[in-house]
Amino acid sequence: FIFAGMVMLRGGAAKRLVDFATALVGHWPGGLGIAMVIAMGFFAAFCGSILAAITAVGTIMMPKMLEQGYPRPFVIVLAASAALLEALIPPSNAAILFSALTNVPVSQTFAAGVIPGLILLVFMVIVVLIKCRNIRNPEPASAAERWRSFLGALPGLFTPTIILGGIYAGLLTPSESAAVAGVWAIVMGFFIYRELTFASLCLALKETATITAIIFAIIATATFLSVVLTYSQIPPHIVRYFPDMGATFALFWVALAIICLLLGTFVEIVPVFYLTVPIFAAITLSFNQSLLHLYVVFVAFAGI
């Protein structure tokens, strides 16, 4: 999925998605900020990596917003916040990781993140509308310009159909759908947009390898700590004593939110998953609650 996103960045698909979002809402109050949020939502539907989303969408939108007069701190925070959509809207690397740690089917974690991700997107749009209502905006795009931008973005917009349609139709596993998305991104770059070259494809491979190496270096350390916790029998003790302390399920959610918020402030979301999901999943099951509910709440707070 990361490779597909990087190829779409180098092959011109990401730029056309951003142009389409800008043509739709760029003239609204805070239009460029809203366009970045929507573009992040588009990108989330075929990539699923927070780092890749900031690289692809942020590098295009952030200079435009700064040039338009948006405050630099707001632009940076908005890009980082909107990138959280990559962890909720499928296909999400966070969903795949959660499924690997809890044995919940990937198709279910993908489905669980759709509505919360869209709700979060809507609230981000509302915040931008309120905070940036006095910033000057570009001229509204004409109907012809919007239609051209839609046609330009259409191959990229078709990518989520390939990924999610293949998974839910039972034709592809998540790994196979990621491979198909990568091939489709190459086809778009070489034959549809004709902006992808062999050199830029190699650059996309290098960027994919770099992002993947960062993620797996974090996973390696987090796995070591997780194994230490397991051999220390800490999770079973917590699960055993948590109800005995008179803790309710509502109190558990409050504790989970605080812990995830604190850890997510200082640590990448991947090690937070490895360190805490096994413990939280066991407690959730002890209360006879759904692990999908845990997934959505966990990602929402740990990703802040």
Q: What residues fall within each predicted segment?
A:
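Alpha-helical transmembrane segments of multi-pass membrane transport proteins
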Residues: F1-I304
